């Protein structure tokens, strides 16, 4: 996977994708899940245990997810837009890249001044973490403090799987868990993590 895809260009430009296609897809899936439940209630005699319970639970869980996920996306979109506004108001230099992250997945040598860090901007000076509440960077990692940029890995059923970006700094390791896009709650997979690592490495002056 190269770094010229549309998702990478949106991160370079700091674009939050519109929510309506995402919401429409969720509404469509919700309608399907509800339709399956109605069909089962009207025409299918479901056993009280075993596989029969799964026939009811699967569409029910699908319906619940179709409600919860769009709400999470709306919340993340609002949070990221505020963090972006703070970053743009505070910096006189346009970032070369925007890296949305999972706030709960950040690991740093020192406690963050704001645990709700939503994204990092990247420019010739380094990486700067932003939250929706602060007009100043809540995390600052200059390039001269970054020694290496690697993939963070973990053991997953006997296999090493990439789950984040590992920054080896002079103050200790910093681990970031990127999200797939601004305004989206989903974390990226190993293939996209490799692209993000390459983008960060190429951003170093």
Name each model-derived stretch.
Residues 1-22, 48-122:
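Anionic N-terminal interaction surfaces
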Residues 25, 54, 62, 126-129, ...:
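Small side chains
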Residues 29-37, 62-69:
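Alpha-helical transmembrane segments and immediately adjacent membrane-interfacial amphipathic helices
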Residues 35-55:
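Membrane-interfacial hairpin junctions
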Residues 39-41, 101-105, 152-155:
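Short regulatory "switch" loops immediately downstream of catalytic or recognition motifs
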Residues 112, 116, 123-162:
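Phosphoinositide-binding peripheral membrane targeting modules
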Residues 121-123, 166-167:
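Short beta-strand element of the conserved SAM-dependent methyltransferase core
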Residues 147-205:
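Acidic, Ser/Thr- and proline-rich intrinsically disordered linker/docking segments
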